[in-house]
UniProtKB/Swiss-Prot annotation:
Organism: Chlorobium luteolum (strain DSM 273 / BCRC 81028 / 2530) (Pelodictyon luteolum)
Protein's recorded name: Large ribosomal subunit protein bL19
Single GO molecular function: structural constituent of ribosome
Keyword Ribosomal protein: yes
Gene3D superfamilies: 2.30.30.790
Gene this chain is encoded by: rplS
Function comment: This protein is located at the 30S-50S ribosomal subunit interface and may play a role in the structure and function of the aminoacyl-tRNA binding site.
Amino acid sequence: MDQLIQLVEATQPGVECPALNPGDTVRIQLRVIEGEKERLQAFEGVVISDRGAGASKTITVRKISHGVGVERIIPVNSPNIESVTVLKHGKARRSKLFYLRKRTGKAALKVKERKVSEQA
């Protein structure tokens, strides 16, 4: 059974996705189909959760839009993802940042920044 799952996951096309950790601020370009037209929509926010592995991995991204918190669960290997850009690397001591849901204003997106060394 495990071999069958690995075979299916190996054939799944995926977007080259950088390493995403809770606390990172990301911008995800998603393809949106409206009627017969297709356009790109940017969703920028803080990764508050990741779960799963392989082809079934998902991340939860949270942003504040006009004073209202918006969360979106995004499958990492979705064919609707055009690109993923990490804007800031956050330093989080937890794997799930659900406590950000209770915060308001700028504090709702405040996560300490983590220094990342560039490797060539």
